[in-house]
Amino acid sequence: DKDSEGLLLMTNHGDILNKIMRAGNYHEKEYEVEIDRPVTEKFIQKMQQGVWLSQLEVKTRPCKVRKIGEKKFSIILTQGLNRQIRRMCQACGCKVLRLKRVRIMNISLGNLKTGEYREVSDREIEELYERIKESRS
């Protein structure tokens, strides 16, 4: 999504990437989101329970949502529908102003700034392989 920012995993191992991103494997992806109105308890509950996306004719899976600012929240998804967070917010009556992926499974963005990169550590790779070993591609 060109309107998003944050963590990207780059690899020559397509099978690994498929296992990570495949919705049926329920791997966590975490985002920080800024919207155009205050984050309320009602909004959090609706998002957490799953939201009906009429464009895709599907209800999103339950997810974890936590308020981190007046108009900001953190969301952890185990699904990867196209523009899912933007569509969920739209269905709840708000617009996404900023969307940043901060974690994919055990790999976090940390303090990296836009344009910076780092190699995944041996420990992170070992844990990643352990988590995806039962996953389907």
Show which residues each predicted segment covers.
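Basic, flexible Lys/Arg- and Gly-enriched helix-loop patches that mediate nucleic-acid binding at interfaces
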Residues: 2-137
